Each structure stands twice: as C-alpha cells, then as structure tokens.
C-alpha cells in the first residue's frame, strides 16, 4: 500500500506499508531518496548490498543506483525523493 502525500517537479513524499514478504523489486530513480522506517523491519538493498532498517532508522538511496525494498515483517516507511 502506498499513499502519495506531496509531489511536484522537485520532490515526492510517499508513505508505504508492506506486509511480511512484500517487496518492491530492483529499480532506479532519477532522484536521491531518503527513507525513514516508521514501524517494523525492512531490508533496503542498494547496489546489491542489503541494509536492515528498524523503526526510527533512515537510509539514503542515491539517484541512479539500483535499489529494492523488502518487508521482513510488517513494515512502514516514509520515502522522500528529491529530483
């Protein structure tokens, strides 16, 4: 589930909720993406390297680098992309 909270040519803010085992497959974005885990545990893979993200933790996914998101359990995250 995702809900776009704000979007324009320079910025996108989206709330995501994943069930356990749900994922967004590997892709690239034209903007730098800042992810904050709001609840649960997720795995963010950037350039093939996995990072486990817990509630309150954040990570940056650089523009034009392949990345993916996986819900290791129910997982909520806020995604802010700056173009």
PLM feature spans:
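A short glycine-rich, His/Asp/Glu-containing loop-to-beta-strand
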Residues: 1-22
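Short acidic-glycine-tyrosine-enriched beta hairpin
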Residues: 48-63
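Ligand-binding loop in jelly-roll beta-barrel domains
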Residues: 63-83
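A generic "binding-loop/recognition-motif" signal
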Residues: 11, 20, 30, 49, ...
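A cytosolic small-molecule/anion-sensing beta-strand core signal
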Residues: 38-39, 54-55, 73
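Short, conserved beta-strand element in jelly-roll/cupin
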Residues: 17-19, 30-44
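Short, surface-exposed secondary-structure edge patches
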Residues: 15, 34, 49-52
